[in-house]
Amino acid sequence: MRCLPVFVILLLLIASAPSVDAQPKTKDDVPLAPLHDNIRSTLQTLRKKVCCRPVQDCCSGK
């Protein structure tokens, strides 16, 4: 029973320790922000091609 509080405190300290990247960055690493922007613009283009017809009003920003 004496070890339980010590064990809990150690677990809390380990959980709050700053994490370290397991692999160092290389020059080939690409930031994810430009990839998300590309995906977003591609999805917008596809949405316009699929649902922007005169009968449908999905292009109005709804």
Curated annotation (Swiss-Prot):
For whether the record's keyword set contains Ribonucleoprotein, the answer is no
Q: Which residues does the propeptide include?
A: 23-49
Q: Which residues form the signal peptide?
A: 1-22
Residues with Serine amide modification = S60
Localization, per the record, is: Secreted
- Here the disulfide bonds are none
Instruction: Name the Gene Ontology molecular function terms of this record.
Output: toxin activity
Specify one Pfam family.
Chi-conotoxin
Q: In which tissues is it expressed?
A: Expressed by the venom duct.
List the InterPro entries: T-conotoxin (IPR031565)
Cite the entry's keywords alphabetically. Answer: Amidation, Cleavage on pair of basic residues, Disulfide bond, Secreted, Signal, Toxin
User: From what superkingdom does this record's organism come?
Assistant: Eukaryota
Modifications the protein undergoes after translation, according to the UniProt entry = Contains 2 disulfide bonds that can be either 'C1-C3, C2-C4' or 'C1-C4, C2-C3', since these disulfide connectivities have been observed for conotoxins with cysteine framework V (for examples, see AC P0DQQ7 and AC P81755).
Annotated domain remarks: The cysteine framework is V (CC-CC).
The family annotation for this protein states: Belongs to the conotoxin T superfamily.
The entry's protein name is Conotoxin Gm5.2
Species name:
Conus gloriamaris
